[in-house]
Design a protein with these regions (language model features):
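Intrinsic disorder and flexible/low-complexity segments
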Residues: 159-164, 168-201, 319, 390-447
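C-terminal long alpha-helix characteristic of the crotonase
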Residues: 84-85, 116-163, 328-334, 363-404
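Charged, glycine-interspersed solvent-exposed loop segments at helix/strand-loop junctions
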Residues: 29-129, 280, 284-365, 369-375, ...
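Extended, hydrophobic alpha-helical segments in both membrane/secreted and soluble proteins
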Residues: 6, 105, 191-195, 204-269, ...
Length: 447
C-alpha cells in the first residue's frame, strides 16, 4: 500500500488509498482447453502452485492456505508500521480499510488521521518554500531521483582501495537471454562469469548478493549456486533479499555466509516443477497432421505435437524428484540443517522473511544497509568503497547492444499489453527456457 510508505513522512498531504491486500491470480485452463492445448505437469511439493493457472480454475486448498497466511502476515506488518507512525490503533486501521475511504470526501482521510491536511498540487512548491524559508519569488531547487543517484556516484573512493561489491541479481533466472523482453533478468552464464571475476579481484573484500527474484530455470539456479559457493571460499558472501527471493531465488541464496531478508520478503518455495504443452488438440482443430521417423525410442522426446507416453512421464517425474532432492540437499548444507528439517518447511511453500527467520531459512531481518554492515564486519576491514555490479549500461549502449527487432517488438508489446506485459513475458520465458523450473508460484501485486 502506498500509505505504508507515505505514513513514515513527517507530514502527509493527500487522500489515502487504504484498502488492504489482495492476491488475484488468473487461470488459463478453460482458455487452453477451448483452443485444444493441454499442459502436461510434473512437480514435487504440495504448495508448488505455479502450475495451477494452467491446470485448474481456482486455487487449491493448499495454495489458498499459504497465500492467506502470507498476505495476512504482510498486512499485519503494514498496519503495525502505520499504527506506529500515525498513532492510530491497528483495529481502527482495519475499520478504515473496510470503509474504502478513497470514495469518501478527501476530508475524511484527515479526520481519520491518515493525512494531516489537504493541499492542491500547485500549492506544494510554495509550501515547501515556506518550510525552508525561501521567498515565494525565489527559485526552489529540487533534486530528482537521477540527481540523487549522481550524488552517490560522485562520492570519492576510499583511499584504502578496499571494495565491497553489491551484485544485483534481479528478475527471472534463465539459461540464456529471453527474446520476449528487452530485460535479461538473471542469465545463468553471465552471472557465473561476473561472480568469477569478483572472486579473482583481490580489491573486492566482500560481496553482498542482492537477490530480487521469483526463481526460474532449475539448471541455471544450480550453476549459480555453485558459483556463489566458489566465491564464498575466497571472501564473505552476504545475501540481501528484496521483495522476493523464492524458489530458484532461494536456491542461489542458501549457500551464503549470512542471509538478510526484509520482514515482508517472500522467500522459501523450495520445490521444482516441469510443464510442457501438448498441442495435438489444437492441430486437430485446424487440420494440421504430424508424423515422425526416428532412430531411437526417445529421439522425439519433448515434441509438443503429441502427448507424453507413460515411459516418458516416468522419466520426467524421476528427473523432477531428483532435482527436488538436490534442492533440499543444497538448502540443508547451506543452512546447516538436516534434510528432514528442510523437508518439513519445503514442499514449495512460500514464507515471509519474518517467518523464514523463525524457521531458520534466513539469519537476520533488515535491508541492504544491514547486509553491508555484516559484510564489512566479516571482511575485517575499516575503510572501503561500495561498488555496484553488474555495471549499468547507459541507454544508448544498451540500445546498440540489443537486436533492433527484439527491442522494437518488446517496446510495442509493452505499450499494447500494458499491465499484462509482465504475464506475457512469463509465458514467453516458460516457452523458451528449460522445461524444469524452480519458480515462485505466483506474482504478488500489493494494492
Amino acid at each position: 500500500s502506498t500509505h505504508c510508505i507515505s505514513s513514515a513522512a513527517s507530514d502527509v498531504y493527500k487522500r489515502q488509498e487504504w484498502r488492504g491486500i489482495a492476491s488475484a491470480p488468473l487461470f488459463y485452463k478453460d482458455l487452453l482447453q477451448k483452443i485444444g492445448v493441454e499442459m502436461q505437469v510434473f512437480k514435487v511439493g504440495t504448495y508448488k502452485s505455479a502450475v495451477e493457472p494452467f491446470i485448474a480454475t481456482e486455487m487449491s486448498p493448499a495454495n489458498r492456505e499459504q497465500v492467506t497466511t502470507f498476505i495476512t502476515s504482510i498486512w499485519g506488518q503494514v498496519t503495525e508500521g502505520v499504527s506506529t507512525s500515525r498513532n492510530i490503533s491497528v483495529d481502527s486501521l482495519n475499520v478504515y480499510a473496510d470503509r474504502m475511504l478513497m470514495f469518501y470526501p478527501a476530508e475524511e482521510s484527515v479526520k481519520c488521521g491518515l493525512a494531516d491536511t489537504l493541499i492542491y498540487r500547485n500549492d506544494v512548491r510554495n509550501y515547501l518554500k515556506k518550510l525552508v524559508e525561501i521567498n515565494e519569488d525565489d527559485n526552489l531547487p529540487i533534486l530528482g531521483l537521477g540527481d540523487m543517484m549522481n550524488v552517490r556516484k560522485n562520492v570519492p573512493k576510499d583511499k584504502s582501495g578496499n571494495i565491497v561489491a553489491v551484485y544485483y541479481a534481479s528478475g527471472e533466472i534463465t539459461d540464456y537471454p529471453s527474446s520476449a523482453t528487452s530485460e535479461d533478468g538473471i542469465v545463468g552464464s553471465k552471472v557465473i562469469r561476473d561472480l568469477r571475476k569478483l572472486k579473482d579481484n583481490d580489491d573486492v573484500k566482500a560481496v553482498v548478493l542482492r537477490v530480487n527474484s521469483p526463481g526460474g530455470s532449475a539448471f541455471a539456479s544450480e550453476q549459480i549456486w555453485h558459483a556463489v559457493k566458489e566465491l564464498k571460499t575466497k571472501k564473505p558472501v552476504i545475501v540481501s533479499m528484496g521483495d522476493y527471493a523464492a524458489s530458484g531465488g532461494y536456491y542461489i541464496s542458501c549457500v551464503a555466509d549470512t542471509i538478510v531478508a526484509e520482514p515482508t520478503t517472500l522467500t522459501g518455495s523450495i520445490g521444482i516443477f516441469g510443464m510442457i504443452p501438448n498441442v495435438k488438440g489444437l492441430t486437430d482443430k485446424i487440420g494440421l497432421s504430424y508424423d515422425v521417423v526416428k532412430t531411437n525410442k526417445y529421439a522425439d522426446f519433448g515434441n509438443i505435437m503429441r502427448p507424453f507416453n507413460e515411459d516418458e512421464k516416468s522419466l520426467l517425474q524421476m528427473m523432477i524428484t531428483e532435482g527436488y532432492d538436490t534442492f533440499v540437499t543444497r538448502c540443508a548444507e547451506g543452512r546447516h540443517m538436516t534434510k528432514e528439517a528442510i523437508e518439513k518447511i519445503a514442499e514449495g511453500r512460500v514464507w515471509t522473511g519474518e517467518t523464514a527467520k523463525e524457521l531458520g531459512l534466513v539469519d537476520e531481518l533488515g535491508g541492504i544497509d544491514k547486509a553491508l554492515d555484516i559484510a564489512v564486519a566479516k571482511a575485517g576491514i575499516e575503510g572501503y568503497t561500495v561498488v555496484s555490479y553488474p555495471e549499468k549500461q547507459d541507454f544508448l549502449s544498451s540500445l546498440l547492444d540489443t537486436k533492433p527487432t527484439n527491442y522494437v517488438e518488446s517496446q510495442l508489446l509493452k505499450s499494447k499489453l500494458g499491465e499484462y506485459y509482465q504475464q506475457f513475458g512469463l509465458l514467453k520465458n516458460l516457452q523458451e527456457q528449460s522445461m524444469i523450473q524452480a519458480r515462485i508460484p505466483f506474482e504478488l501485486n500489493i494494492k
